[in-house]
Each structure stands twice: as structure tokens, then as C-alpha cells.
Amino acid sequence: MSSTKRQKNRVLVKLKKRKVRKDKIEKWAELALSALGLNNVELSVYITDDQEIRELNKTYRKKDKPTDVLSFPMGEEFGGYKILGDVVISQDTAERQARELGHSLEEEVKRLIVHGIVHLLGYDHEKGGEEEKKFRELENYVLSKLSKAL
């Protein structure tokens, strides 16, 4: 009889911009993955600037402008983990949005991490209709779980 060893999720964080602490980003991502019932997954989160995310947005989405968050799904297995993918966040855009929405940069980065993870799971709010509804419901569910856990 074989048993599957349950592993913790692995979150890798790279910071080009450093206004939000790495340990907080790791914790938020780990809590989000847990709220979604995901196990043995690896997620990368990269905090960058408008210039770099604009280049990524232009290359991968053919949109020559900065955006708040991009998600790059992987789905491969490596070292006992399913590599969920990469979430890339522009701290510059996150700062502007936080000011516009009247909350902290940390709150906005937390929201964007969750938003990016929901995209990695295959949901797409840009399709509108029922797909957008499912996306928003899942995003709000995870954000409420994070609020209760923090």
C-alpha cells in the first residue's frame, strides 16, 4: 500500500521593489493557497515596477501598457510539487490603485496575489458573464479567509 506524503506548499518570492516585506507576501500567498485547498503546489510571486510589467504585458498579451498583475500558469510537476505558476505584480500600479481605493499598499498587494492565483487556476473575469461571476466569488471567498486568518 502506498501513501502520499502531504507536503506543504512552497512560495518563492522575488522583490525588485521592496516596500512590502517578503515574509508578508509569503504568508498571504500560503494562506490563499490553503484557503483554496491546494497542497503540494509551488507558486512564484515577483514584485516589479511598471516598466518591466509593461514589457511583459506587451510581449505576452500584446498590450503596450503597464498593468497591476500578470499570471503565468505552468502546471508541471517538479520535486514533488505541482508548479502552479508565476504571479507578477507591479508595485507602482499597486501603489496608485491603493491610493485610489483608499487602502494600504499591503492590502492591494494581498488582493493582487489572490487575483493572480485565481487566474492561475483557470478563471478569467475578462470573459464577463458567468465566468466573471465565478472569478469574483472565488476571489472574494479567498480574501475573506485571509481577513479572518490575519
Curated annotation (Swiss-Prot):
Cofactor binding annotation: Binds 1 zinc ion.
Cofactor(s), names only, from the UniProt record: Zn(2+)
Keyword presence, Zinc: yes
MF terms in GO: metalloendopeptidase activity; RNA endonuclease activity; zinc ion binding
EC number(s) given by UniProt: 3.1.-.-
Family matches, as InterPro entries: MetalPrtase_cat_dom_sf_prd, YbeY, YbeY_CS
Gene3D superfamilies cross-referenced by the UniProt entry: Metalloproteases ('zincins'), catalytic domain (3.40.390.30)
Listed GO CC annotations: cytoplasm
Enzyme class: hydrolase
Localization of this protein: Cytoplasm
Record's keyword annotation contains Metal-binding: yes
BP-aspect Gene Ontology terms: rRNA processing
Keywords: Cytoplasm, Endonuclease, Hydrolase, Metal-binding, Nuclease, Ribosome biogenesis, rRNA processing, Zinc
Residues bound to Zn(2+): H115, H119, H125
Segments crossing the lipid bilayer: none
Protein family: Belongs to the endoribonuclease YbeY family.
HAMAP family xrefs: Endoribonucl_YbeY
Functional note: Single strand-specific metallo-endoribonuclease involved in late-stage 70S ribosome quality control and in maturation of the 3' terminus of the 16S rRNA.
PANTHER family: ENDORIBONUCLEASE YBEY, CHLOROPLASTIC (PTHR46986:SF1)
NCBIfam families named in the record: rRNA maturation RNase YbeY (TIGR00043)
Protein name, as recorded: Endoribonuclease YbeY
